[in-house]
Amino acid sequence: MNACERLSRVLERIQKACERAGRGENCAKLLGASKTVPPEVIREFYNCGLKVYGENRVQEFLKKYEALKDLDLEWHFIGRLQTNKVKYLMGKVVLIHSLDRKNLADEIQKRAFKNNIVQDVLIEVNVGGEETKGGVEPENLKELFEYTLELPNVKVLGLMTIPPYLENPEDVRPYFRKLRELRDELQREYNVALPHLSMGMSHDFEVAIEEGATIVRIGTLLFGERKY
């Protein structure tokens, strides 16, 4: 299968999941999780119509950003983010998916203010309670969210999670549901709009869409197994 065929197959599956969930057309945005994917492959997928990509490593992202500057791409940052790397993302990524602590929020505020922009972010929540993963614990989410409300150059648009990897996607459903419930609770309690839920990857994105995902992060199904 070539790039365009792989892309259209994934888009078709997204569409069907949206319909099953009764959520209407284009209910979830497809983000190409392009860690380790070379610029020429991204260019190929761009020519097939995929314009949204997410990177995990700042250094790798900056190289691709420069190499693909001639394309009208929408870049997201989806990996764990060190405070000393925040400055390199300003003005280059439309959405940071991995805000999970106050000092990172402070740094994004500082750098966004310097650049005279408002940086859109998602708060990453560790719904599975896994020690190896980033993300704020669900019980500390409100505290972090309240903290961001005081930062004029940081705008939270929703939540993100990387749930435990389980063979059967159905077993992941409770984690996706939990994230949606946490988002709904914040919206009610603080009377704010948090339109985005970034959840679901190659093996479980359909279940994520059924549970309310608005952004799915797909790597393997588009680009093949990762070459580390």
Curated annotation (Swiss-Prot):
GO molecular function: pyridoxal phosphate binding
Disulfide partners: none
Modified residues (N6-(pyridoxal phosphate)lysine): K35
InterPro entries in the cross-refs: Ala_racemase_N, PLP-binding_barrel, PyrdxlP_homeostasis
Biological function: Pyridoxal 5'-phosphate (PLP)-binding protein, which is involved in PLP homeostasis.
Family (UniProt): Belongs to the pyridoxal phosphate-binding protein YggS/PROSC family.
Protein name from the UniProt record: Pyridoxal phosphate homeostasis protein
Organism of this sequence: Aquifex aeolicus (strain VF5)
